[in-house]
């Protein structure tokens, strides 16, 4: 690992990737804390453009691991889980292919929030609205991803209720040892595998950190 730092892998499920994935891969390699490996779980080999993405890793300190899946084998929880099992890093960051780091500090700030306490199992980034998103989407992002960081645990259930378990599959970091101990993401989940895992972690006495200074832009267009 760089400078004796903790080893970090980034796991990205990809389906018919395009410009966003290229932008994401370029920005990940410019992070102040560079990932050791980027593991791409790609659905259907024919949609992967090797000439476009693989040269981005030539001469890079970050390695590419590419795993092709059949479409029927893809599901949100199970595919990410396979990626985490493929990793040997202490920390795994799961990102969607349309999540773009807002600046060069995303990985550093996300990992710092995760490492701030031994009992923190996961940390998730702040989602910034894309410049051209609508008013309702902007409001929802601001509501779910406020400007102040916080750590959530069992003691917050009375006040926050189900929001205690809020996490994000757009950009979140996990301590791999705790993840494996708790059994990881539920396979065959269509969505919310991150919140199901967060609920399991909180009930087991762990905490979830929201890192407001780790910023990603999700642009679905």
Model region roles, listed by residue range:
Residues 17-30:
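Short, well-formed alpha-helical segments that are part of the catalytic scaffolds
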Residues 36-45, 67-69:
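Short beta-strand/loop segment that forms part of the nucleotide-sugar
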Residues 70-87:
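Glycine-rich, basic loop-to-helix element that forms the pyrophosphate-binding segment
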Residues 90-100:
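Short beta-strand-to-loop acidic/aromatic patch adjacent to the donor-nucleotide binding site
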Residues 104-138:
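Conserved donor NDP-sugar-binding/catalytic core segment of glycosyltransferases
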Residues 125, 143-164:
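Short, flexible, basic/aromatic active-site loop/helix in glycosyltransferases
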Residues 155-174, 190, 196:
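A recurrent flexible, glycine/aromatic-enriched loop bordering the glycosyltransferase active site
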Residues 168-169, 180-199, 207-210, 214-217:
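Donor nucleotide-sugar recognition loop
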